[in-house]
Design a protein with these regions (language model features):
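Long, C-terminal catalytic modules of enzymes
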Residues: 370, 374-376
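Aromatic (often tryptophan-rich) hydrophobic motifs at membrane interfaces
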Residues: 66-67, 96, 107-108, 112-118, ...
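Short, high-confidence coil segments that cap the C-terminus of an alpha-helix
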Residues: 59-61, 123-125, 251, 305-308
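Residues forming anionic-ligand binding surfaces in small-molecule and nucleic-acid pockets
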Residues: 90-97
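The substrate-binding groove and active-site-proximal loops of carbohydrate-active enzymes
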Residues: 99-104
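Active-site/acyl-donor-binding loops of N-acyltransferases
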Residues: 2-11, 15, 19, 80, ...
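A conserved beta-strand-loop-helix scaffold within acyl/acetyltransferase catalytic domains
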Residues: 13-69, 73-88, 133-152, 156, ...
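ATP-hydrolysis module of ASCE/P-loop NTPase motor domains
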Residues: 121-138
Length: 381
């Protein structure tokens, strides 16, 4: 364990390099997460620990923790992994959405964030690639702008639920959409008995999760799936993490079944009056009934009934999410803090690659819109 003194702030920073050291913080870690303006379930101690157990491989923990006296007042959960011969600093979790420096309530954010940011900027790495930050990140604010570039990657739509589901559904679903939903439900019921189940306890969740893996595999069969939800390691990780979180009543898995067979699910994690969408899928054999949309709506209704004030979709601005969005709070990728010549070259190449992909994506979108406009013009003519 490394101890580094921070001058003048009465804050000392340690770097934890072993899982055992991190495990010792289990009782106090989540208080830091709950103190976040936008609490991330992907920074909860259980989630991070299980992710590391399943995905560590040859990575090295570098969890920076800040103390004032004996009190834990801040943390920055990082790890260093080797990719393409480079030592790259990442958040534990890799895709730990909404990740940031953690700061205890009542602390001077500039002092704690500054101490942790200073430690991160002097790590033994080539560069840092931190995915999951937000535009309001306290870590980013504490880093020199010239050393760290923040790039928006996901639009992250948010739906406000505080007015109750009846009001939300009336405002978000047109009369035509509500009529279509009822019609498709009747069509589905003509196939066989329709059941809706909401798993939340460990005993309920264990079998429901296996069905979710099956449905997810059907949905993504033959397609590029980067979610890790259905890989052998991914399934083992989600079983371990979600079942442990279920002991804290934080998981909700809504399943839609026909003839006793699940055909769609919506999986979410609840934290601090917010529901965070984790995964949704449906059996494409039933696609004409829109079971994925129905499972999503039922999941949102259940969250509102429990008193959740907002639902975070955490993804891109896809049409099925945008139609429900009240606002957007984008998720970003932070790249920089290069410490070596190779790191500086890698940062420049990575940023250039992102710019090129964005340009190509915009160009492809523009071409599709132009082609569609031409078709519509021809139809009107």
């Amino acid at each position: 364990m490394t101890v580094i003194a921070q001058p003048g702030a009465d804050v000392r920073v340690r770097t934890l390099s072993s899982e055992d050291e991190f495990t010792e913080l289990a009782d106090v870690w989540d208080d830091l997460v709950l103190a976040m303006t936008r609490p991330s379930p992907f920074l909860l101690h259980t989630w991070l620990r299980e992710w590391w157990r399943h995905y560590a491989n040859d990575g090295q923990l570098a969890i920076h923790v800040a103390y004032r006296g004996d009190r834990l007042v801040g943390a920055l959960p990082l790890s260093v992994r080797r990719r393409h011969g480079l030592r790259i600093t990442e958040f534990i979790g890799g895709w730990a959405l909404l990740a940031d420096v953690l700061i205890a309530r009542g602390e001077d954010e500039s002092v704690v964030a500054g101490a942790l940011a200073e430690r991160a900027s002097t790590m033994d790495h080539d560069f840092a690639d931190l995915y999951g930050l937000t535009g309001a990140s306290r870590l980013v604010a504490a880093l020199p702008p010239a050393d760290f570039r923040l790039i928006e990657r996901l639009e992250a739509p948010i739906l406000e639920l505080s007015s109750g589901w009846e009001a939300v559904s009336q405002s978000k679903l047109s009369p035509k959409a509500r009529s279509m939903r009822r019609r498709r439900r009747r069509q589905l019921e003509a196939v066989g008995p329709v059941e809706v189940a909401l798993a939340r306890t460990r005993e309920e969740l264990a079998p429901a999760l296996e069905e979710a893996f099956r449905v997810h595999a059907l949905r993504w069969q033959g397609r590029n799936d980067s979610s890790e939800f259905a890989t052998p390691v991914g399934k083992a990780f989600h079983r371990a993490a979600l079942l442990r979180l279920a002991d804290d009543d934080a998981v909700r898995l809504l399943t839609l079944s026909v003839n006793g067979k699940p055909i769609a699910f919506a999986l979410s994690v609840q934290l601090a009056d917010r529901a965070y969408g984790l995964r949704r899928a449906f059996d494409p054999a039933f696609g004409r009934f829109s079971p994925g949309s129905e499972a999503k709506l039922l999941s949102l209704e259940a969250a509102a009934a429990e008193g959740m004030e907002r639902s975070e979709f955490l993804g891109a601005a896809a049409p099925h999410n945008v139609r429900f969005a009240d606002t957007f709070d984008p998720i970003c990728q932070g790249i920089g803090l290069a410490r070596t010549p190779r790191g500086r070259v890698a940062v420049a190449a990575l940023l250039a690659g992102i710019r090129i992909r964005r340009t190509l994506k915009r160009s492809a979108t523009a071409r599709r819109l132009y082609a569609r406009a031409r078709r519509l013009k021809g139809t009107r003519a």
